[in-house]
Amino acid sequence: MIVIRSLEQLHTFTEPCVIALGTFDGLHLGHKDVIGSAKEYAQQHGERLAVFTFSNHPLSLIKPELVPVALLSQEQKHACFEAMGVDLLLDIPFNEALANLSPQEFLQKLGVLKFSCLVVGENFSFGKGGAGNIQTLTAFAQGNNCKLIVRPLVSDDATVISSTAIRHLIAAGEVAKARYMLGRAYSLSGTVVRGAQRGNKIGFPTANLALEAAKIAVPSIGVYAVKVYFDGKCYKGMGNIGNNPTFGELKEARLEVNIFDFDGDLYDKEITVAFYERIRGEVKFN
């Protein structure tokens, strides 16, 4: 997968392509529907699949105090795009220059690429102040011999699948429902930190991850059925998110995972913990 991080570098990609456009901050089923539609069209016409998105949430510039917690780290997002078969990722910083482009100026810059089709969700907007919409894209497509595919929003019964809805589910600990909307288990990745190592003393060695709750979505305090991935292997386990009430003097919130059928040393190693179901709230053991 080729990654371009600047509008000024778009000219370096010269192959015919189909572009899916969106914030794609959660890569949930709605986002996958847009990208999947673009992929299908690209395959049918022998063209490359391109995705245009932002490396930072637009609100980080417009209203920093309202920036939502992330559902994916940049590394996770790139891995997901690659797994979906994206050939070209346009991962563009949302900065003042981009925010001030009119819809027409944005499309003019995008027009450097040789695309035959644009694919968006029905609520897509772009350009300064979000002035560009489906009508804008329709007029552009008609005037530039380009196909426009507009995908309807994807719903779970009466609920529209959205990153906001998924954030609420994760915050409430409803990771099973979030898993359905995402089309995958919600996961956290990080380096195992060295804790007090008391788990070893009571016969249940654990891996600990410090949580940056201000930056990435963290499930509510409780115990979860999880799967743990590292070194190309997968293990089942039980994860506890909370303030470690068993050891009352420990105040920092962490994810503590008991990995079944594993007794190795994971300190300083990178692991990914996928959440499948909330078992119960956090309980202090006497």
Regions found by a protein language model. Name each.
Residues N100-P205:
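Classical nucleotidyltransferase
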Residues S73-L90:
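A glycine-rich helix N-cap at a beta->alpha junction
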Residues V69-K77, A99-L107:
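Glycine-rich, highly charged phosphate/nucleotide-binding loops
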Residues L10-S73:
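N-terminal catalytic cores of NTP/NDP-binding nucleotidyl/phosphoryl-transfer enzymes
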Residues N144, G195-N286:
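Phosphate/ribose-recognition catalytic cores of enzymes acting on nucleotide-derived substrates
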Residues I2-Q9:
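Short acidic-hydrophobic, aromatic-tinged amphipathic segments that line or gate anion-handling sites
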Residues H28, F81, L118, A178, ...:
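Residue-level signal for inorganic ion chemistry
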